[in-house]
């Protein structure tokens, strides 16, 4: 048996986690002196309230070694193989903690740690594929091999409503944040080679910006793997999300269109009103 585990930044819904029998290892979110578990003891809306009140971005940290060992140990004792996914190594030490836990359990030969080189449902796309393979009886080595092949084909991007949260987190300077607010600029953030990079900038109200962003990807979307696409957002209004879904449905490409809410870690850095369309290219 192969067990699939991911850290909480995969942003998969509780329904998907249950459907595919995936275990989630929460990262930590620190609001001042208080520490919370991503997806378990705090919500994104609570994070926004705290961040706006204190004019700063919460700190996030990897799971502890003890927590990781506690999650892994029962599966190791049962003789399972484990394939676990972490947020990009350039963004967190989550993957390193997983490797340390494998060493502490003397199970390096049965625990495979995959650096997703991604975030949010860019990880989730890989995790779901791995879980399907595990259910179909594939070995950990077979799953890991396919994941390494798929990683460069994951297309993860999003547009943000406000640059305030990126500025608070040190991901853009004060001048850019102020100009973005005055000019109503909304950057497209793309994940490439495990890092985030701002590419095209859109101007206008966020609802129209989101639709422009999605329609600009039409050619790539039509060439995507048809299994599934994620509309991942951090609290966009329902009408906007529905408009994105309608556009994706009109393409006639995807068998499954999923709408997860971004988790606490991603929401901490991007703020409310962020939306991304994530898929795997053929």
Model-based region annotation:
Residues 35-106:
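Class I S-adenosyl-L-methionine
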Residues 3, 9-23, 28, 34, ...:
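Mixed-charge interfacial surface used for oligomerization/domain docking
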